[in-house]
Structure formats: structure tokens, C-alpha cells
Amino acid sequence: MKKAFLIILSTLIFPLCVFANDKEDIMATFDKYVKDANSYSTNLPNYYIENAKIVRIVNKKQGGKKAVVIPFDRYLKELKGHSNLAKVVNYKNNYIDRKIEKIDNDYKLSATRVPRNDKTGLPAHFIFTKVGNSWKIKEESMTTNVQVFLTAK
């Protein structure tokens, strides 16, 4: 009886330990990502899976929101091109109120993104998936007030 109880208990506790370790690994990966992004590192593409989904939720000036999906190859080009300007103006994002939830085999990290001159912050989320022994961004979604995303091709 005691042995059966221990087996049942261990099958209940083990998944919780794995979940806790995954959350810690994802948070550590995200911290590195933010540090690299804020230092304009050229290795940012390494944090993403190939053809990751990139979404910008634009707060429209006339009211409402519009989701814009950016092709990953275009995102990489823009990332490379805009990093010099971001460096000149010392643009950085901070992420507060971070939460992680498990979604099937992936994890969703939700946070409030506080850009350089923003006072209130904007919603953001990243979906991480396991690739080999590391966690990669499968989807990135950020709310923005930048209107150019509405007309970008």
C-alpha cells in the first residue's frame, strides 16, 4: 500500500518539477533575449524558430486595433536595418508583469512591454517551443502605437 502511494505521489509531483524547470529555462532564455535585444546584438535571429510568426497589434489613431502579421524574412531584414537607428536613439524595451502558462507542448510568456518613452506599457506575448535542448520563440506578438505597420508591405 505504501509503495503504491509513493508511485502515485511521484507521478503527480514529477510533471510539476518538469514544468517548474521549463518555466525557469524559458524565463532565463527570455532574459537573455531581452538583454541581447536591448544591446542590439546580431544574434537575435537565433532566438526564433525558422518562419516564426511575428504579429503587431496596432492601436489605430482613429480607435480600434488591427493585427498585422509580418513575414519572418521581412522581420529579419527590418530587424537588421533598424538596429542602427535604435542604437543611436538608445531604444530599449523592458518587460514587466511576466507570466508563463503551458499550452500543449509549448509555453506562452505574457508580459507588459514598456518601450523607451512609454508610461503605461503595452501587451506582448511570446510562445516558446522546445527545439533540441533549447527554447525558441515560435510566435511573437506585441501591441504598438506605431502606425507604419498598417501600411507596410
State where each predicted segment sits.
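A general lysine-centric signal
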Residues: K2-K3, K130
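Sec-dependent N-terminal signal peptides
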Residues: K3-F19
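Short, low-complexity N-terminal intrinsically disordered segments enriched in polar/charged residues
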Residues: L16-N46
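Exposed acidic/polar residues on beta-strands and adjacent loops within beta-sheet cores, strongest
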Residues: E24, D97-E101, K153
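Short, well-ordered alpha-helical segments enriched in acidic and aromatic residues
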Residues: Y40-V58
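Polyampholytic, low-complexity intrinsically disordered segments
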Residues: Q62-K65
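Surface-exposed, charged secondary-structure patches
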Residues: A67-K119
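Short beta-strand edge/turn micro-motifs at domain boundaries
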Residues: D106-S110, N117-K153
